[in-house]
Amino acid sequence: MKKGIHPELKLITVKCTCGAEHKFWTMKEDIKIDLCSNCHPFYKGDTGSLIVDTEGRVQKFRNKYGDNY
């Protein structure tokens, strides 16, 4: 392999909105995520609320079309 042409890998901490932190090797500087395996309903075993809407799109759709779609 040629030297100096490959990007440098860094160990970064990925931060979730729930407060969990995960370490990954990547070329990026900083990553923030909305959901991780600690707070996602699927991984927590909550199968009743698999719709995760962080921006209100589901409620906006239901307000526009009702429950009879």
Curated annotation (Swiss-Prot):
One of its GO terms (molecular function) is structural constituent of ribosome. Pfam families: Ribosomal_L31 (PF01197). Keywords: Metal-binding, Ribonucleoprotein, Ribosomal protein, RNA-binding, rRNA-binding, Zinc. Zn(2+) binds at C16, C18, C36, C39. One of its GO terms (biological process) is translation. Binds 1 zinc ion per subunit. GO terms for cellular component: ribonucleoprotein complex; ribosome. Gene3D superfamilies: Ribosomal protein L31 (4.10.830.30). Its cofactor is Zn(2+). Transmembrane segments: none annotated. NCBIfam families: L31 (TIGR00105), PRK00019.1 (NF000612). Belongs to the bacterial ribosomal protein bL31 family. Type A subfamily. Binds the 23S rRNA. Part of the 50S ribosomal subunit. HAMAP family: Ribosomal_bL31_1 (MF_00501). PANTHER family: 50S RIBOSOMAL PROTEIN L31, CHLOROPLASTIC, LARGE RIBOSOMAL SUBUNIT PROTEIN BL31C. This is Large ribosomal subunit protein bL31. It comes from Kosmotoga olearia (strain ATCC BAA-1733 / DSM 21960 / TBF 19.5.1). The lineage of its organism: Bacteria, Thermotogati, Thermotogota, Thermotogae, Kosmotogales.
